[in-house]
Regions:
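An anion-binding loop in the catalytic cleft
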Residues: 52-147
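Active-site-proximal loop/hinge segments within enzyme catalytic domains
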Residues: 1-91
Length: 147
């Protein structure tokens, strides 16, 4: 992620220098936007990062996780407590074992049942606390995740 950011910054700097030079030399040709080709994206707010495991697919959740890195971040609510997700990965184990309980502690993290599959939360953050690994959550918040 940092490498990509650095590459984009260096490309922007080069293009900005060329664009400023062209503006000063009056070499830019202005083209009016065709509003029929324009698209609209709704405003991203804090609620955009909220997920509901029972209604969203694993793919949708991974896409939101990638899209909302940094801000607003991804979070879910359990027992009326918002919990931020800081690490996710695919689950390769027995998906049938999660039918009765939406959350299950496994070696890699916390396995969570989604609308179509299962994913694993590897790092999370409780309100006002630091980011912890799922294994730390097992030790300190095991009862919290019981249904």
């Amino acid at each position: 992620r940092v490498d990509l950011e650095n590459k984009l910054v260096s490309l922007c700097i080069k293009n900005l220098q060329n664009d400023l030079r062209n503006i000063l030399n009056s070499k830019l040709i202005l083209i009016e936007q065709n509003n029929n080709d324009a698209s609209y994206c709704s405003k991203i707010d804090k609620l955009s990062g909220k997920i509901d495991f029972t209604k969203e697919s694993t793919r949708e959740i991974f896409q939101k996780f990638k899209a909302f890195v940094g801000w607003p971040g991804l979070y879910f609510e359990k027992n009326n407590t918002p919990i931020k997700i800081h690490g996710l990965k695919e689950y390769n184990g027995n998906k049938e074992a999660l039918k009765e309980n939406n959350f299950r502690f496994i070696e890699e993290g916390i396995a969570v049942k989604t609308s179509d599959s299962v994913l694993v939360i590897t790092h999370l953050q409780f309100p006002g606390r630091r980011i912890i690994s799922a294994s730390d959550a097992v030790n300190s918040h095991a009862k919290f995740f019981e249904n």
